[in-house]
Amino acid sequence: MGQKIHPHGLRLGITSDWKSHWYADQSYADYVAEDIKIRDFLSKGLDRAGIADVVIERTRDRVRVDIHTARPGIVIGRRGAEADRIRRELEKLTGKQVALNILEVKNIDANAQLVAQSIAEQLSNRVAFRRAMRKAIQSAMRQPQVKGIKVVCSGRLGGAEMSRTERYHEGRVPLHTLRAEIDYGTYEAHTTFGRIGVKVWIYKGDVVGGRRESEINAPAERRGRGDRNARPRRGGQRRQRAEQKQEG
């Protein structure tokens, strides 16, 4: 079940939070449809801005839209012209006053949606799919909070006659563990051979007692190769034994 279901929906209220914050009785269906229109408008109109997430919060006469983006300069525009245009379009769509918040995503390689979008853009530019997938995995695993990643590409890979699915993963991605913080993102690459779907799962540790392991481990240095001078060199033990024999 954990392999099939959306990781965010499975963990709502446990490790993940809702992306729409509002309450409605009779207008529930209208608000849901409006949220979908807002997200579609932002994803299609700002496809080059690297939109990672859109959080919508509603009050009686106001709508607040938080846009998490990798390139805030594109969303803001010159002297805020693009942000004003987006605000006007959203006010026209919702019929209410819109407060627009643009938030920058600091760590691009640890965000599943941005990783999926990056792979899809490379596939659209005719980069080999294996190269794009492996490069994304290597970049993600260098981040201190990332403990595992899985990438799936499906479609006419490499222009093949028959579509197929390719999977690559590194580290742990426990999809059945509810306390696990799993980031999930999807994107479509439009190529001359057709569409190629990209899915990315990123495991960032567990959430224990309301504290995220990724936030605790973020400042610490990742366990890597370390300092070359701090490691024992090859033949170091043999040299020590030889010196001890000479002294003896």
Curated annotation (Swiss-Prot):
Organism domain of life: Bacteria
rRNA-binding as UniProt keyword: yes
Pfam family, one: KH_2
Keyword terms of this UniProt record: Ribonucleoprotein, Ribosomal protein, RNA-binding, rRNA-binding
Disulfide bonds: none
Any GO BP annotation: translation
GO cellular component terms attached to this protein's record: cytosolic small ribosomal subunit
Database matches in SMART domains: KH
Record domain KH type-2: where: 38-106
Annotated region (Disordered), positions in chain: 213-248
GO molecular function annotations of the record: mRNA binding; rRNA binding; structural constituent of ribosome
Biased composition regions of type Basic and acidic residues, renumbered to the chain: 213-230
Functional description taken from the UniProt entry: Binds the lower part of the 30S subunit head. Binds mRNA in the 70S ribosome, positioning it for translation.
Complex and partners: Part of the 30S ribosomal subunit. Forms a tight complex with proteins S10 and S14.
Listed PANTHER family: 30S/40S RIBOSOMAL PROTEIN S3, SMALL RIBOSOMAL SUBUNIT PROTEIN US3C
Protein family (similarity comment): Belongs to the universal ribosomal protein uS3 family.
Protein name per the record: Small ribosomal subunit protein uS3
Species of origin: Corynebacterium efficiens (strain DSM 44549 / YS-314 / AJ 12310 / JCM 11189 / NBRC 100395)
Lineage: Bacteria, Bacillati, Actinomycetota, Actinomycetes, Mycobacteriales
